[in-house]
């Protein structure tokens, strides 16, 4: 029956086979007339056998030979089972160890403070925060009411921190105390005028100190550490007022100038957290700033506390309003490098940023926040290190550390390099601060650990 009229299912295969055979014979003449038709093996599709994993394993065991596909001996089987069991136990151990390490970071470290001075109070009941009267300098004078001069040489040193000093600050306004932190997990307060000794230490972190900041009234200071914690200490008693446990390393902390209860923390996960210790909910967190794309490097408030500046490893500098998660200005350029340190000029509307291309750049504090094309300070080597910078009390000079153990000083108005002092130790000088009341005294320290005073 033809294809148009339909077909019979019972004879369809026979017809198709005969038609195919006749066509094949016609094409090849009489070659196959006397031979029986045998379909080739290529036309026969054998069904592939599928085995389970256990069946395949059983088949491999029955194979003979010493090759890679040979049979398995009972000892090899036992060895493989033992190795699998050992691997599972090892995975469980590694997982448990990771959990223990995570828990160890959250373990409370014993917070203690020891006083090493002669007496904690004077005859009138005042602590060491009260500025001394028996020194040649009026420590209550306004900061910019005197003229500063260049430091010329190293005059003395403090033991500092044997494994390296990572944070260094004068007590604001008076400068009769030095606050330092180091890789030995310890914070120390030093006497600057009398016995040049450590007055008190603060122990409460289990990893190196990252940053230290005084509050405006100097009654407290903030500390951040690689143990992912931020603590607020009482400067005189050594007691911890507030402690925060974070999920990322706090790279920098900054206290708001007009409000000692507020502070910001820059994290290595690119976020900036704004805290108020008067708020009880959520550990006092009032705002999160999350526009940066990489780790926060430095934070600095405007002198009036209305805004703050942030620098990040994403090679941008951003300016923020308080408690508004939208930056009002982003400073970026294709040739711009990371800027690991920020500082504000004491008398003019500028802030400076230490750059990884061995330069210090100046930016305006007024809207548009443009970079000053002529106020660029260079000559030192800062690439690869988070080196700090400081201004003299009257704003005439700017000084910076150096990766080759030197202290550089420039003229602020002309950007001219005035001098550099070789610091003992032959290690990078990463911490620098200018005395707020002395005309030419600068402290500096770094990986060597000792704190040097230049005058």
Swiss-Prot record:
Which InterPro entries does the record associate with it? G-protein_beta_WD-40_rep, PRPF17, WD40/YVTN_repeat-like_dom_sf, WD40_repeat_dom_sf, WD40_rpt
What Pfam families does the database record attribute to this sequence?
A: WD40
Give start-end ranges for the coiled-coil region(s). Answer: none
A GO CC annotation given for this chain: spliceosomal complex
Q: Mention one GO molecular function.
A: mRNA binding
Q: Which UniProt keywords apply?
A: mRNA processing, mRNA splicing, Nucleus, Repeat, Spliceosome, WD repeat
- GO biological process per UniProt: generation of catalytic spliceosome for second transesterification step; mRNA 3'-splice site recognition; mRNA branch site recognition; mRNA splicing, via spliceosome
Places the protein is found: Nucleus
Source organism superkingdom = Eukaryota
Give the main location: nucleus
Each WD repeat, start to end: 160-200, 204-243, 291-330, 334-373, 379-422, 424-454
Subunit structure comment from the entry: Belongs to the CWC complex (or CEF1-associated complex), a spliceosome sub-complex reminiscent of a late-stage spliceosome composed of the U2, U5 and U6 snRNAs and at least BUD13, BUD31, BRR2, CDC40, CEF1, CLF1, CUS1, CWC2, CWC15, CWC21, CWC22, CWC23, CWC24, CWC25, CWC27, ECM2, HSH155, IST3, ISY1, LEA1, MSL1, NTC20, PRP8, PRP9, PRP11, PRP19, PRP21, PRP22, PRP45, PRP46, SLU7, SMB1, SMD1, SMD2, SMD3, SMX2, SMX3, SNT309, SNU114, SPP2, SYF1, SYF2, RSE1 and YJU2.
| Function field | May function in the second step of pre-mRNA splicing. Regulatory protein involved in replication and mitotic spindle formation and/or maintenance. Required for initiation and completion of S-phase and for initiation and completion of DNA replication. Might be required for the maintenance of microtubules. Essential only at elevated temperatures.
Task: Output this protein's name.
Answer: Pre-mRNA-processing factor 17
- Lineage per the UniProt record: Eukaryota, Fungi, Dikarya, Ascomycota, Saccharomycotina
């Amino acid at each position: 029956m033809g294809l148009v009229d339909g077909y019979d299912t019972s004879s369809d295969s026979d017809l198709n086979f005969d038609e195919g055979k006749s066509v094949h014979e016609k094409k090849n003449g009489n070659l196959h007339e006397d031979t029986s038709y045998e379909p080739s093996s290529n036309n026969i599709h054998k069904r592939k056998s599928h085995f389970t994993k256990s069946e395949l394993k059983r088949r491999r065991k029955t194979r003979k030979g010493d090759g890679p596909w040979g049979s398995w001996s009972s000892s090899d089987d036992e060895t493989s089972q033992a190795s699998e069991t050992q691997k599972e136990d090892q995975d469980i151990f590694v997982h448990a160890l990771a959990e223990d390490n995570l828990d160890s970071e959250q373990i409370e470290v014993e917070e203690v403070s020891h006083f090493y001075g002669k007496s904690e109070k004077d005859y009138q009941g005042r602590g060491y925060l009260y500025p001394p009267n028996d020194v040649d300098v009026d420590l209550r004078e306004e900061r910019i009411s005197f003229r500063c001069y260049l430091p010329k040489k190293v005059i003395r040193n403090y033991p500092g921190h044997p494994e390296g000093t990572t944070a260094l600050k004068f007590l604001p306004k008076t400068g009769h105390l030095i606050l330092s932190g180091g890789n030995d997990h310890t914070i120390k307060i030093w006497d600057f005028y009398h016995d040049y000794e450590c007055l008190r230490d603060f122990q409460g972190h289990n990893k190196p100190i990252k940053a230290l900041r005084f509050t405006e009234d100097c009654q407290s200071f903030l500390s951040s550490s690689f143990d992912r914690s931020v603590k607020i200490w009482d400067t005189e008693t050594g007691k911890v007022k507030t402690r925060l446990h974070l999920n990322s390393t706090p790279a920098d902390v900054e206290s708001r100038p007009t409000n000692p209860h507020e502070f910001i923390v820059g994290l290595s996960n690119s976020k900036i957290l704004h805290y108020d210790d008067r708020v009880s909910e959520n550990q006092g967190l009032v705002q999160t700033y999350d526009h940066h794309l990489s780790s926060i490097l430095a934070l600095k408030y405007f002198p009036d506390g209305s805004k703050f500046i942030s620098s990040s490893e994403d090679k941008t500098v951003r300016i923020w309003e308080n408690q508004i998660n939208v930056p009002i200005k982003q400073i970026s350029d294709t040739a711009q490098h990371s800027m690991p340190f920020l500082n504000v000029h004491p008398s003019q509307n500028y802030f400076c940023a230490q750059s990884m291309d061995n330069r210090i750049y100046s930016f305006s504090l007024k809207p548009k926040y443009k970079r000053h094309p002529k106020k660029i300070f260079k000559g030192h080597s800062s690439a690869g290190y988070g080196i700090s910078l400081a201004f003299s009390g009257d704003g005439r000079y700017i000084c910076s550390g150096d990766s080759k153990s030197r202290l550089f000083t420039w003229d602020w108005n002309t950007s001219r390099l005035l001098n550099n002092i070789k610091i003992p130790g032959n290690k990078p000088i990463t911490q620098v601060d200018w005395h707020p009341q002395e005309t030419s005294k600068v402290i500096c320290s770094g990986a060597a650990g000792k704190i040097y005073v230049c005058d």
